[in-house]
Regions:
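Transmembrane alpha-helical segments of polytopic membrane transport and secretion proteins
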Residues: 160-174
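Amphipathic cytosolic juxtamembrane alpha-helices at the membrane-cytosol interface
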Residues: 39-40, 64-96
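Periplasmic/extracellular loop-to-transmembrane helix junction in inner-membrane transport proteins
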Residues: 30, 84-88, 129-138, 174
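Membrane-water interface segments at the C-terminal ends of transmembrane alpha-helices
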Residues: 1-62, 90-110, 141-160
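Helix-loop junctions at the membrane interface of multi-pass solute transporters
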Residues: 54-63, 74, 115, 131
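Glycine-rich helix-loop "coupling/hinge" segments at transmembrane-helix boundaries
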Residues: 110-136
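Hydrophobic alpha-helical segments that mediate membrane insertion or helix-helix packing
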Residues: 1, 70-73, 127, 141
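Short membrane-interfacial helix/loop motifs at transmembrane-helix boundaries
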Residues: 21, 115-119, 171-173
């Protein structure tokens, strides 16, 4: 359900929870952290991208064969070696793809910076201000839009490249 909400809703949830008159601020009696600027952006982006990362990693964890862990333990590997070779190694492609996906979502997001970004500028707010600001400058806005396009294309190509590192097992026996 959180993935279906507009991103500005996350900013409003942060304001209503952690703001000066927020629910958690009233509960604890003190504002836990400054929600405007970098702190608010970081917190908003984490709660915005956490469900996507969780779904990707959880899905991959379902495809990891548990028999490899048993074999690793029988062969005398330590707990750390078992974890690194049988859990973390198959997850590397998904972890990298999750990081790229989260970067792409945060890079193109406008709602969270608009609500809790404060004076902290991100590319999406710069594009909005150039195109729809008080004095629109379409030439500069077009340059910013093209500059936004380059990391987006690189992200898509990187995701396509990382797809080959996803977990794939062929069943030899049942």
């Amino acid at each position: 359900l959180p993935m279906l909400l507009p991103t500005i809703t996350y900013g409003f949830a942060i304001i209503y929870s952690f703001g000066k008159q927020g629910l958690l601020t009233r509960l604890f009696g003190v504002q836990l952290f400054d929600i405007y600027g970098f702190n608010g952006l970081l917190f908003g982006y984490v709660i915005y991208t956490l469900p996507i990362s969780f779904m990707l990693i959880h899905n991959t964890m379902g495809f990891i064969d548990k028999k490899f862990m048993v074999v690793s333990r029988v062969m005398g590997d330590s707990n750390t070696a078992t974890f690194l070779q049988t859990v973390l190694r198959p997850l590397l492609g998904t972890l990298a793809a999750s990081m790229v996906q989260c970067f792409f979502l945060c890079f193109t997001d406008y709602g969270i910076p608009a609500s809790v970004g404060g004076e902290y500028d991100v590319v999406a707010t710069v594009l909005y201000n150039e195109m729809l600001g008080s004095i629109p400058n379409f030439n500069r806005g077009a340059v910013v839009a093209v500059m936004m396009l380059i990391p987006s294309v690189i992200s898509i190509l990187l995701l396509h490249y990382l797809e080959r590192y996803n977990v794939r097992y062929n069943k030899i026996s049942t």
